[in-house]
């Protein structure tokens, strides 16, 4: 078998002729022919019983970068959900002409070239302080070129729906427009006590200290589902030089990775690992079914190096659905300046479930046990579809995610590539944003962000969806 290398485009005529000649010389009794991967799989299928079978999850280790552009990822997921609804309702024929036009425009969106190659077009070893980055984006053509390319690729999901007939095009565009709904206003006074929401099926207590759900009780069973820091706890994580050294030693020693996967020039700055969580919140009830929360933002003293670009606002909204065991959570991150320093934003969900095999992750329609990852695979970060579910003999917990898709089981697992077992009593942690990976992914981001989640409780015996 002869395949082409990564990012090299189609074979040239000369390379095709050379491939045929060399293969015929090496295998004179064989028939040499071009084939698709599907045709190759069909040829191998009769031999499948004699081949090794791997049933464990591999765990893609190259998915960090997809968290670098929340707007693009959210839009892509929204268009795909809309397409699924059209197919389910009979409004779109799967594999029909309209569907293929739409998918043809969408296919480039998840592909890993989200812009220019950073190892070639972003070799600057400066720009890690916010004022340096601002100046470079204004004055340095290479920085500006990267911005333009990331912006163009970000528009791909929105541009894709333009190939649809007018009714569907307008519907999809309206749904994409809703993704930019701004954060609500919340009174500036700090909440003196926890706030509570309840319906006939569940009761939620929202902490005045963290803004997270500190208690979530299924009123049908009396079970308390929130553990530790609760459900919906926000965190900011900054990474330092030592984090990247450890990651390089563990993951990839190749020389090219310093520029391609790393942060060239970061060692020139006094950057240290940093973890910050809000220490207070303002809250306000909106009717009987919703609470708006404004989280405290950090004082400058948290990072005197001026290497961190904090959001100016972090806003949460909790909404209970009437007569349902569901709680919707929306998180807005507003006014965050662009920052080249490696960083990540998280929303954590610590669930009171003690069955170590109770968790499953929805990955391309399959229910994956996060413990069942092959040795050397990526067990600490997964890309999910609907989200994560937990089941035991006494009930169940669903965490559905509409916009964010990267989940780290058992703790913050970015830049971690060991084979230590997971401790899922430490919950599921949704990565809202990170700029850790290089290649062609955005290295900074200054758009407002919005993330939607749904928590659903189940009585015992209810199946996963």
Each model region followed by its residue ranges:
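Catalytic-domain carbohydrate-binding cleft regions of carbohydrate-active enzymes
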Residues: 1-157, 287-465
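Catalytic and substrate-binding regions of extracellular carbohydrate-active enzymes
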Residues: 100, 108-114, 118-335, 445-449
